[in-house]
Amino acid sequence: MPKASADYIWMDGELVPWADAKLHVATECVLRGENVFEGIRAYWNETSGQLHIFRHADHIARLRQGARIMRMTIPYTDAEIEDACLTLLRANRFRETVHFRPVVYFAEGELTQYLPDEIRTGMFILAIPMPSKSSLKTGVKSGVSTWRRNSDLSSPSRVKSGANYHNSRLAYIEARLN
């Protein structure tokens, strides 16, 4: 099981010690899951002694597309996001395969309805060691869930958003407990 932490998180333009990276409980990110993210893998190559990021630019483009659908303005350019990811990976000195996640979120609001330009948009990137799953070699059991994917007409399921992942969490729990 990978450790669920690293030395640093990149948060709003700065490297922050893992234990000091905090969001207020009144953020829309916490209260309503208003965020978009990408999950990206960087594979460790022992021979070259380097991490190799899988389709980094494509993931950043999809992050930006999801933010656009959610009417969030990412406060960084694609080049700045890519540089932030590299800075974070280097600062943590990983020598193993890593999963990292850039997250764009709405910050503190008025706890009522608001327009996107009336609320601050923040960003953080976290990275943790995550080796390949053993199921790649052993296979998996499968089943049909009673939970159905949310309609794209009610909540854009094509967007990687924290709020959208509750649906898949319910299906996962059902599969594990049955």
Segments (PLM) and residue ranges:
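Helix-start/capping segments and mature chain N-termini
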Residues: M1-P75, E80-T87, L111-N178
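Short, acidic/charged, Gly/Pro-enriched secondary-structure junctions
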Residues: E82-E110
